[in-house]
Amino acid sequence: MTFQTPDSSHEHIAFIGGGNMASAIIGGLLKRGLPAGQIQVIEPFSEQRARLAQQFQVEVSEAPGASLNRAAMVVWAVKPQTFRDAAEQSRAHVGHALHLSVAAGIRSDTIAGWLGTERVVRAMPNTPALIGQGMSALFARPAATAADRQAVERVVQTMGAYLWLDQEAQLDAVTALSGSGPAYVFYFIEAMIQAGTEMGLSREQAHKLAVGTFVGASALAQEATEPPEVLRARVTSKGGTTYAALTSMEQSGIKAQFIQAMQAARQRASEMGDEFGAS
């Protein structure tokens, strides 16, 4: 694996934050051949540091320091509310590096200001990244070179699929759609399981049927050339069982409520940029 950053003679990568998303990326990088000795993690919690060291055999530290000078890339896998403090502690050591943020809400101009560099890329992944099946959207500031983008892609592809955005504001919509999206799917799976048990199935049976249906339908939607509304129409015969269910949903305004809920998520993503990025 080669990061190909123009001002670095090595492939060292540092993670600020060692939670689930960082662990998913680290695991993917190791599987793709990046030596553990070229990865370091800054993680304030001792339990997390012990887990990371044992699981991945990577270098772990409690706080940022001069060791960050080695990093060709720094991945910011911190909570939005702790980003600023972490950035201020690290700034003196990471000005030369390419920066990839997976923190929700914090805008790239804010990150660039905190770090004193314009080589910043934002990513919005989602939790299926934990098993390499995630969907991420990326936005790069103009100072990020083509080589920087390629380096980011090599990291992000360890989490699953990705796409690039032309406008950073679109990341708020991405957060509402795919970033929070897995929770919506789990919510509907919960409802299907509950309905199944209320109709006489065991919980195990309902769980297997509900999850299997989402997996199969998602695979079909991904492979099909037709849009989802066509696929839905094909299995909806007027007067049939599917028709009865969808008619009930439409009469209850479920689609409109769902869209409204996603708008609320987008609005909250925008607010987080103001709230946690305020000077």
Annotate each predicted stretch with a short phrase.
Residues 1-63, 114, 197-198:
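NAD(P)+-binding Rossmann beta1-loop-alpha1 motif at the extreme N-terminus of oxidoreductases
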Residues 2-3, 7, 211-279:
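NAD(P)-dependent Rossmann-like dehydrogenase/reductase catalytic/cofactor-binding core
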Residues 26, 46, 56, 64-138, ...:
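Rossmann-like NAD(P)(H) cofactor-binding subdomain of soluble oxidoreductases
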Residues 36-39, 96-97, 119, 204:
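Short acidic capping loops at alpha-helix termini that bridge into adjacent secondary structure
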Residues 39, 67, 202-209, 231, ...:
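Small-residue helix-packing motif on alpha-helices
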Residues 110, 114-119, 135-173, 186-223, ...:
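Internal alpha-helical scaffold of NAD(P)-dependent oxidoreductase catalytic cores
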Residues 120, 170-176, 228-233:
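Short pre-catalytic strand/loop immediately N-terminal to key active-site residues, enriched for Gly-Thr
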